[in-house]
A protein has these predicted regions:
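Short, structured interface segments
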Residues: 28, 34-37
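An extended, acidic
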Residues: 37-139
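DPxDG-like acidic metal-binding loop motif
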Residues: 1-30
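Short gly/ser/thr-rich secondary-structure transition/capping motifs
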Residues: 31-32, 104
Length: 139
């Protein structure tokens, strides 16, 4: 949900696992009513990342490719993934998840909010954010 060009709430449901991820601006991120927090890892080689197929080929990170950006971001918020990056993705694919990451204590970078539909996004915990961004400078 957007209000005044700001994402104020978001919901992602995984019917396979019966998991409901929800975030509200300034009120936190939740999974089935349990508060979420991003990973506390700070050694990038110990981290697990998600991206699209181009990201998997580009990066030397430990990677998973799920094919669902919204759920990938929910997993970053839950600490299941340590980071997520994707280029040229639609805002509606990442709006809810980006709020979830932020409300779970993570950082979302390169989110060119609502200037056009295709955006670039990088999301992670504060502990690895700078290292991740440096690795992805040419992505």
């Amino acid at each position: 949900l957007q209000s005044n060009k700001e994402i104020v709430s978001g919901l992602i449901f995984d019917p396979i696992k019966d998991e409901m991820f929800f975030a509200e601006k300034n009120k936190g991120s939740y999974l089935n009513n349990q508060r979420l927090r991003v990973s506390k890892k700070n050694v990038i080689d110990d981290c697990l990342f998600s991206s699209n197929h181009n990201g998997v080929r580009f990066s030397n990170f430990n990677m998973r490719y799920t094919g669902c950006a919204a759920l990938d971001l929910a997993y970053v918020a839950a600490g299941r993934f340590d980071g997520f990056f994707h280029n040229d993705i639609n805002i509606w694919d990442v709006a809810a998840g980006s709020l979830m990451v932020q409300e779970a204590g993570g950082l979302v970078n390169d989110l060119n909010k609502f200037n056009n539909n295709a955006i670039n996004i990088r999301a992670s915990s504060d502990g690895i954010n700078d290292k991740m961004l440096k690795e992805l400078e040419n992505f």
